[in-house]
Design a protein with these regions (language model features):
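Phosphate-group recognition and catalysis centered on beta-loop-alpha active-site segments
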Residues: 1-234
Length: 234
């Protein structure tokens, strides 16, 4: 990763490297604003220990989340979800992973009504079946359940049942081993929409491209684009 995660510099850098989509994580502030952040606190990405759900947007926006990565990114702040969409190139997509089990839909509704997000440029992700089901029920936008196969002992039937429970659009699966690769192959062969993460290994990248998965999420977009170019050139 060449820029601090879940920041505008990171998204912009990925777009510049030629990707057609980015994945970001979303949490809700105390005053119900949607911001891009992975963890439930700022401890890992800054010198602050603010808890996201217990602070207002104004308070969280005062925290530098770039300096811990590099002085080059000093004065980089947590973006609103809308700010991430505002820097998105035309005809590109954002995979929006909703981290909590429940959030207010007020801001998402506003973004849909104003045309900021749509089924053409957005795909929701989440780890909670009820949250995914609620997103599907509320919005005309794909929503897919994220799965860590190891939590299911790599059991195809258990995972399939979990996907059905959420009414998931497809499967968003963690790739960590040959077992996980065999699983995603099965899901792809049965016609599921397949998103894979977090793929930083070149061999897995090549194999997933060969398999024809619908999305590969990586911490290293430049490496992935190079692998795609190699495949194109034979």
């Amino acid at each position: 990763m060449e820029a601090p995660e879940n920041t505008l510099p990171a998204y912009i850098k990925a777009w510049e490297q030629g990707v057609d989509a980015v994945e970001l994580d979303v949490r809700e502030t105390k005053d119900k604003r949607l911001i891009c952040i992975h963890d439930d606190s700022l401890a890992r990405v800054s010198e602050s220990e603010y808890t996201i759900s217990q602070e207002t947007l104004a308070a969280l926006k005062t925290v530098d989340v770039g300096s811990s990565r590099s002085k080059k990114f000093a004065n980089t702040y947590i973006p609103l979800l809308k700010e991430a969409f505002d820097c998105k190139p035309d005809k590109s997509k954002i995979f929006v992973e909703i981290k909590p089990s429940k959030i207010s839909f007020n801001e998402l509704n506003e973004m849909v009504e104003t045309g900021v997000i749509s089924k053409l440029n957005t795909h929701f992700l989440g780890f909670y079946p009820n949250a995914v089901k609620s997103l599907i029920k509320t919005f005309d936008i794909p929503a897919t359940l994220s799965i860590i196969p190891a939590f299911f002992d790599y059991d195809y039937k258990k995972i399939s049942s979990f996907l059905e429970k959420s009414k998931s659009f497809g499967i968003s699966q963690h790739i960590d081993s040959k077992k996980s690769m065999n699983l995603i192959k099965k899901f792809k062969e049965e016609g599921k929409y397949c998103i894979t993460w977090t793929v930083n290994n070149k061999k897995y990248m090549r194999d997933l491209i060969e398999l024809g998965v619908d999305a590969i999420i990586t911490d290293n977009p430049k490496k992935l684009m190079n692998v795609i170019e190699e495949k194109r050139n034979g």
